[in-house]
A protein has these predicted regions:
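Anaerobic metallocofactor- and corrinoid-dependent redox/one-carbon enzyme cores
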Residues: 2-37, 41-45, 55, 178, ...
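Electropositive, gly/pro-rich neighborhoods at or near active sites that engage anionic ligands
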Residues: 43-201
Length: 534
């Protein structure tokens, strides 16, 4: 594959075939893409050195998880940071198998993997290995966040190694398919782990109304997904006259009791990640990126971008593991914020949003929900969830939610919700018709609700009046999709376009066995989805 780069892991990849020029659509340069491939190859070499199926230490697992997370879309644009990560992986391999580097007759069994072998492979093999790779990249983000809170799972850790080992060897479609579904199985465990970590650390999320108004005076915007970073920043800014506003996937933080107690956690600024270059333009406040999604900043706010953990951008101030946020705090005081309160609105004009309808909150009303379904007051549930993005066509999700019948409830999670989360759809029997369940990893909660409802009605999840309408952009959406497939969930609508890494044969397999279909129009899809449960 004689191209400057090759990457097709995100939904916006050029022509739905792959980014191959001087830079990707996400903004990463060709050299950065090549370094990400080198890092992935080094990770596969590390997995080979461990022999794939062997148990691994916590230290080795953390290196693998950090390395995989670094390659997720919109995480790191910093070549130096990626090179440092590559050396970290190689050092861990040297620690585990020091004799390999000194061997006079190398066997090749622990060599690093050349990713060109994958990109140039038979299209079905490439498709399945890509599903595995992108799935574990997404899962690594969840494992990383759990690890930050000192939660880990030995089975999850070991599977990263097993999956990388599989990618590095010749396999058949028949032997790869079970591993693809196993990514979904292990990701379910990983999301459960993160759910436990978040709720045991910060409390069970509670339905919470969040203002979109930014008060006058100094403030800091926190984006990404990492609740621990937000907690530490709240602690360090307490009493300093600085307000904190969430952005994007940090919105659900407002629902956690331990975080809600901070009076200077005021509200949410902006919408989803792809609007940041417009929303942050000349922003009189610093922005702290705790995870993806980072876009190359415009010059009008580049001096107020701060990164931490695996997020990195050349020239941006990086807050290291000591977590001293003094530079961010000083920048907030220097910029001063707005002179007067600023009333902002969501995409549809709403000035407040509600979050915190996690699985515990919804299931606390389980009897009400069951009775409403039996009486006919609730006729259908829609899970309209997933990533947002810049590609045209994503207004489909806004229109879909607007057009859902008045006797239906829409559940949502992840940043795709910003297309419609400021809408007021009213209530059914005291329950909001639109409920935000949280971040993308809170897909675990949606699954728990679905399973509980199926148990209550004595049926399978596929027999429930429940439909999945998903939007995707990056690799966390891939691992969630694989979890749904592992659970046997059928008739999922996926958009706005299908993944470029799905070959025609693999796509056909998913269509025939799981009923996956691309989104069409809101009207047609609502009609078709509701007909499944007649």
């Amino acid at each position: 594959m004689d191209k400057k780069m090759f990457c097709f892991q995100c939904e916006q990849t050029v022509g739905c075939t792959g980014c191959t020029g001087n830079a990707g659509v996400c903004g990463k340069k060709a050299d950065t893409s090549k370094l990400q491939d080198e890092l992935t190859g080094a990770l596969i070499g590390l997995a080979r050195a461990i022999d794939g199926t062997a148990a691994i230490s916590k230290e080795t697992a953390q290196v693998i998880i950090e390395g995989l997370f670094t390659t997720v879309t919109n995480v790191s644009f910093d070549d130096a940071a990626i090179k440092t990560m590559i050396q970290k992986v190689r050092a861990e391999k040297e620690r585990l198998v020091p004799d390999c580097s000194k061997c006079q007759s190398p066997c090749g069994r622990t060599d690093e993997y050349d990713m060109q072998q994958l990109w140039n492979a038979d299209e079905d093999i490439r498709s399945l290995k890509s599903l595995i790779l992108f799935g574990i990249r997404g899962m690594a983000a969840y494992a990383y966040h759990a690890n930050v809170l000192n939660y880990e799972d030995a089975e999850v850790n070991q599977f990263f190694c097993e999956a990388l080992f599989k990618i590095g060897y010749e396999e058949s479609v028949e032997t790869l398919l079970p591993t693809v579904l196993k990514v979904g199985e292990i990701n379910l465990k990983c999301m459960a782990l993160l759910d436990k970590a978040n709720t045991e650390t910060y409390g069970t999320p509670e339905p919470t109304t969040v203002t979109l108004t930014v008060e006058k005076g100094p403030f800091i915007v926190v984006t990404g997904h990492d609740l621990k970073d937000l907690q530490l920043l709240l602690e360090q800014t307490e009493g300093k006259g600085i307000n904190i506003y969430t952005h994007g996937e940090m919105l659900p933080a407002h629902a956690y009791p331990l975080l809600k107690k901070f009076s200077h956690l005021k509200g949410n600024f902006g919408t989803a990640w792809q609007n940041q270059q417009k929303e942050f333009d000349h922003l009189p406040a610093p922005i702290l990126y705790t995870t993806n999604c980072l876009m190359p900043p415009k010059s009008s706010y580049a001096d107020r971008v701060f990164t931490t953990e695996v997020v990195a951008f050349p020239g941006a101030v990086h807050i290291d593991e000591k977590k001293d946020f003094t530079p961010v705090i000083e920048k907030a005081l220097e910029l001063g914020g707005y002179k007067e309160d600023q009333i902002f609105s969501g995409i549809n004009g709403g000035t407040k949003v509600t979050t915190g309808f996690g699985h515990a909150a919804i299931l606390s009303h389980a009897n009400t929900v069951v009775d409403a379904v039996k009486s006919g007051a609730i006729r259908h549930f829609f899970l309209v969830a997933g990533c947002d993005g810049a590609k045209p066509g994503r207004n489909y999700y806004t229109e879909f939610v607007k057009q859902t019948p008045s006797d239906s409830i829409s559940l949502t999670l992840a940043c795709g919700k910003f297309r419609f989360n400021d809408l007021d759809l009213g209530e059914i029997g005291g329950l909001p018709r639109l409920m935000d369940m949280g971040q993308c990893n809170d897909a675990y909660g949606a699954i728990q609700v679905a399973v509980a409802l199926a148990d209550a009605f004595g049926c399978s999840v596929n027999e429930l009046p429940l439909s999945f309408v998903l939007s995707w952009y990056e690799q966390k959406a891939v691992c969630i999709l694989l979890t749904l497939l592992h659970l046997g969930i059928k008739n999922i609508r996926l958009g706005p376009s299908l993944p470029a890494f799905l070959s025609p044969n693999i796509l056909n397999f998913l269509v025939e066995n799981y009923g996956i279909a691309p989104v069409t129009t809101p009207e047609e899809d609502i009609k078709a989805l509701m007909s499944h449960n007649k």
